[in-house]
Amino acid sequence: MFLLYEYDFFWAFLIISILVPILAFLISGVLAPISKGPEKLSTYESGIEPMGDAWLQFRIRYYMFALVFVVFDVETVFLYPWAMSFDVLGVSVFIEAFIFVLILIIGLVYAWRKGALEWS
């Protein structure tokens, strides 16, 4: 029998986590003073006048490093629970984790050989 009352805490948390940001935006929009002027339109750069154009295009190298970082950060998120319950899970899960890491290493070697990790 499927009992929906077991999920009451989940639904309450979901509704609260949706309502809190919405209410924060609405309240700040109502209470914030409306002031427009040249100070609001100027670029802020550490309290001093900006030197040159404030809008600079990032190099694609930063994007590639960020992408590789995110991939290996997600790998850590997946492997940490596995490492904490390694003795309970057995050999089959070890093989699955090994294949997962192997695929990521192959991707890293591919990115390295393509020159995605070099600054030149």
Curated annotation (Swiss-Prot):
EC nos: 7.1.1.-
UniProt GO molecular function: NADH dehydrogenase (ubiquinone) activity; quinone binding
Bilayer topology term: Multi-pass membrane protein
Keywords linked to the UniProt accession: Chloroplast, Membrane, NAD, NADP, Plastid, Plastoquinone, Quinone, Thylakoid, Translocase, Transmembrane, Transmembrane helix, Transport
Entry keyword annotation includes Signal: no
Compartments reported by the entry: Plastid, Chloroplast thylakoid membrane
Reaction equations catalysed: a plastoquinone + NADH + (n+1) H(+)(in) = a plastoquinol + NAD(+) + n H(+)(out); a plastoquinone + NADPH + (n+1) H(+)(in) = a plastoquinol + NADP(+) + n H(+)(out)
Any GO BP: photosynthesis, light reaction
One GO cellular component term noted in the UniProt record for this chain: NADH dehydrogenase complex
Parts of the chain that traverse the membrane: 9-29, 64-84, 88-108
Gene3D superfamilies according to UniProt: NADH:ubiquinone/plastoquinone oxidoreductase, chain 3
HAMAP family membership: NDH1_NuoA (MF_01394)
Function, in words: NDH shuttles electrons from NAD(P)H:plastoquinone, via FMN and iron-sulfur (Fe-S) centers, to quinones in the photosynthetic chain and possibly in a chloroplast respiratory chain. The immediate electron acceptor for the enzyme in this species is believed to be plastoquinone. Couples the redox reaction to proton translocation, and thus conserves the redox energy in a proton gradient.
Family: Belongs to the complex I subunit 3 family.
Quaternary state and interactors: NDH is composed of at least 16 different subunits, 5 of which are encoded in the nucleus.
Name used for this protein in its record: NAD(P)H-quinone oxidoreductase subunit 3, chloroplastic
Organism: Nicotiana sylvestris
